[in-house]
Amino acid sequence: GLVYGNPASFQIEGFCADFVNDDLWTYLTGGVNNEKVWVFDNGSYGYAAGELTYADPSTTVEWNNWSANWDPGVGHTGDNDIWQSTMTFSLKGGANVSIYNSSSKATTSGTFMLNTSNHTITFTDCELLHTPSWSDRTANWGRDLKLLELDENHMRIGVLRDNSEGPW
C-alpha cells in the first residue's frame, strides 16, 4: 500500500558493480568503469553478410540456438548512411548507453539492463540502433530484446516484428 510522509532526499555516492560481474557484461561494455563502442557489421568482419539477418521462424530462436533463414547482405535496408552509426555501452557510474544514428544525425542516451539468465536486453529512454526506415517493422525496439550471440567481437540481438510481414 501507500505510505504517506514527508519527502526525503538522498544522493547515491557509488555504483555497486557486483551484479555486473559476468562475462556477458564485460563483452558488452568492456567491464566495470569502461565503455565499448559497437558498429554495424558491413559484411567485412566475418560474422554476417550485412546489417541484417533473418532468423528461421520455424526453429527455436534463442541464445546460441538459432539459424539464419536469410542473410541478404550489405545494403538490404536501403540506408547507406547507417554505416557510421554506433552504440556505446558503458559501466561508468551505471549501465548507460549512447546511440548515434548517422542516418538521422541524432544521438539518444539512456540506460540498459542485460538479463544474463534470460539473455535479453532492455533499453530505457532510447532504442536499439536501427535504420530509420525500418522503425515501423516493430513497436518494440527497446524492451526484452533477445540476445542471440555476444562475445568480445560481435553481438546479435533479435527483434520480433509485429507488423503485417510476420514475426521474423
Q: Where in the sequence are the language-model features?
A:
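Lipid interaction determinants
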Residues: G1-T108, N115-W168
